[in-house]
UniProtKB/Swiss-Prot annotation:
Alphabetized Gene3D superfamilies for the sequence: 2-enoyl-CoA Hydratase, Chain A, domain 1 (3.90.226.10)
GO MF annotation, one: serine-type endopeptidase activity
Gene: clpP
Active site (UniProt): S96 (nucleophile), H121
Pfam families the record matches: CLP_protease
Protein task: Cleaves peptides in various proteins in a process that requires ATP hydrolysis. Has a chymotrypsin-like activity. Plays a major role in the degradation of misfolded proteins.
Protein name: ATP-dependent Clp protease proteolytic subunit
A single Gene Ontology CC term: cytoplasm
Length: 196
């Protein structure tokens, strides 16, 4: 069930679902697994807010275990495409594809709550049963290209070398907020809401 917020206006009361009300304040919630329909919703909100006023920041709250690489990269590409700065605020966790999205916020405007976690690892893929050897080779090559793409983005976002990101993402690598800050994925740990 989605909560409803009631506001007093000059014409009486107006009710909003909570997400529509947050959108009025340029807040987008990116929660749950990253998949196509969620990505489409986030992208539509980014485009809407940018068209509404590209001089004002957009606030993207992130709490995700990750998910689809293509859906996540569509969000990242849109964040980079629009003119408005996207501030990212990690709450709970940003894992896997979530780290790529959260670290792609505007430099100097990437935040994390004190008890949130980050996790990087190499992308996963599979070919399913009954797959021909040639298709398996194609899938393996694609997975290597995908890993390179993601590690390049993470290296650019953190200021770390590709080699370090590659080594650190070999297995699940969980980071506290402090470790994430030291790595360079975020710019500040927020104990209270001081966003501009």
């Amino acid at each position: 069930m989605i909560p409803v917020v009631i506001e007093q206006t000059s014409r009486g009361e107006r009710s909003y679902d909570i997400y529509s009300r947050l959108l009025k304040d340029r807040i987008i919630m990116l929660t749950g697994p990253v998949e196509d329909s969620m990505a489409n919703s986030v992208i539509a909100q980014l485009l809407f807010l940018d068209a509404q006023d590209s001089t004002k920041d957009i606030y993207l709250y992130v709490n995700t275990p990750g998910g689809s690489v293509s859906a996540g990269l569509a969000i990242v590409d849109t964040m980079n495409f629009i003119k408005a700065d996207v501030q990212t605020i990690v709450m709970g966790m940003a894992a896997s594809m979530g780290t790529v999205i959260a670290s792609s916020g505007a430099k100097g405007k990437r935040f994390m709550l004190p008890n949130a976690e980050y996790m990087i690892h190499q992308p996963m893929g599979g070919t399913g049963g009954g797959t021909q050897q040639t298709d398996m080779a194609i899938a393996a090559e694609h997975l290597l290209k995908t890993r390179n793409t993601l590690e390049k983005i993470l290296a650019e976002n953190s200021g770390q070398s590709m080699e370090k990101v590659h080594a650190d993402a070999e297995r699940d690598n969980w980071m506290s907020a402090q470790e994430t800050l030291e790595y360079g994925f975020i710019d500040e740990i927020m104990a209270n809401n001081s966003l501009n």
